């Protein structure tokens, strides 16, 4: 499969580029605003994996939707207007979106939901996180997912 990786200069971008190569995928574009990276992807792209920055997601997914290219989003911190543009594109192309793709986190989401259900409304639930001071999205996508999972369990 020919994929474009957006946010290729970032932590996850580097991991994804390496993993794609190990899995025999053809990374046809390594897109990032950092010098030395592609600025967009070409017509031969069959899928886009986006770990860029929230403000870049809407224009990128709209380009993919116009070209009929499936889209995976790992970028977090989207504003409501940005998310609504993603949702509109998801009606036209396959879109997979998560704030965290880790198996452990997704199991934890399920456990938090069940714990909230078991504890009931007599207990307060609080999500507390700690991260480096340069984190771009705070609260993190994972913290928001945990809070939503707890709320849904009520």
Model-derived segments and spans:
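Alpha-helical scaffold segments in soluble metabolic enzymes
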Residues: 15, 19, 47, 59, ...
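Short, well-ordered secondary-structure micro-motifs
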Residues: 40, 84, 108, 137-141
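Short, acidic/turn-prone active-site loops that include or flank metal/cofactor-
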Residues: 33-36, 76-79, 100-101
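N-terminal glycine-/serine-/threonine-rich beta1-alpha1-beta2 phosphate-ribose binding loop
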Residues: 1-67
């Amino acid at each position: 499969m020919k994929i474009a990786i957006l946010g290729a200069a970032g932590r996850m971008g580097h991991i994804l580029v390496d993993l794609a190569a190990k899995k025999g995928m053809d990374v046809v574009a390594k897109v990032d605003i950092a010098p030395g990276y592609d600025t967009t992807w070409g017509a031969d792209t069959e899928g886009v994996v986006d770990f860029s920055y929230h403000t870049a997601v809407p224009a990128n997914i709209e380009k993919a939707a116009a070209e009929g290219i499936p889209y995976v989003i790992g970028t977090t911190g989207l504003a409501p207007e940005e998310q609504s543009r993603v949702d509109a594109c998801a009606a036209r192309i396959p879109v997979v979106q998560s704030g965290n793709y880790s198996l452990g986190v997704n199991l934890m989401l399920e456990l938090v939901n069940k714990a909230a259900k078991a504890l009931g409304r007599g207990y307060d639930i609080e999500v507390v996180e700690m991260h480096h001071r340069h984190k771009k999205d705070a609260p993190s996508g994972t913290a928001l997912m945990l809070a939503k999972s707890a709320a849904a369990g009520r």
